[in-house]
């Protein structure tokens, strides 16, 4: 039986490491309909967040129904009303670009909504589930904040004034909602979720 010398072991490790690096550093080929300009990326990203907002109009009522804390229920109601406004603003943005509002499945939002559903399934109704709902809702908020911030930056560079105005208004509301959820969690919910 052959024993591997330190030099042979190092060669084997180096070869395996080289293969891993090659795979992780591989270039991803662009699809046929890939964005070629910032305007294309902007429009594609608008379709993505449009889908996300429309999906939220269906998911938020489920969160509301499963929440037990009155302040959390109120925060979800407010966010649902704002989400309908966000959909309208996105439709205005598409119209200002001369495009029909079109949704493209947002895998990130789908993942966040699936995770939120999972949290509700894995927690008993009450304070613990409410704390989980807040965590799931804030992950959604953070995704939306990142997306609207990026889209506003694109709109500014592209000189799309109507879109910029609408995107900044929505971005501001998403930040306020995130702070409201933090306040609800900090004031009552997280401490109620501790079993005494």
Q: What are these model-predicted stretches?
A:
Residues 2-196:
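Amphipathic alpha-helical hairpins
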């Amino acid at each position: 039986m052959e024993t591997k010398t330190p030099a042979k072991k190092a060669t084997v490790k180096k070869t395996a490491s080289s293969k891993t690096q090659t795979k992780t550093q591989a270039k991803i080929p662009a699809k046929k309909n890939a964005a070629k300009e910032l305007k294309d990326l902007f429009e594609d990203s608008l379709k993505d967040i449009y889908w996300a907002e429309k999906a939220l109009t269906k998911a938020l009522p489920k969160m509301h129904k499963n929440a037990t804390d009155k302040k959390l229920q109120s925060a979800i109601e407010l966010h649902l009303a704002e989400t309908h406004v966000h959909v309208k603003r996105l439709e205005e943005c598409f119209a200002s670009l001369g495009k029909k509002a079109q949704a493209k499945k947002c895998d990130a939002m789908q993942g966040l909504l699936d995770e939120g559903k999972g949290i509700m399934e894995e927690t008993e109704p009450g304070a613990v589930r409410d704390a989980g709902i807040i965590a799931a809702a804030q992950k959604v908020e953070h995704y939306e904040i990142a997306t609207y911030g990026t889209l506003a930056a694109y709109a500014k560079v592209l000189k799309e004034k109507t879109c910029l105005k609408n995107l900044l208004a929505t971005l501001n509301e998403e930040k306020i909602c995130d702070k409201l959820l933090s306040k609800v969690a900090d004031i009552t919910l997280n401490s109620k979720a501790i079993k005494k």
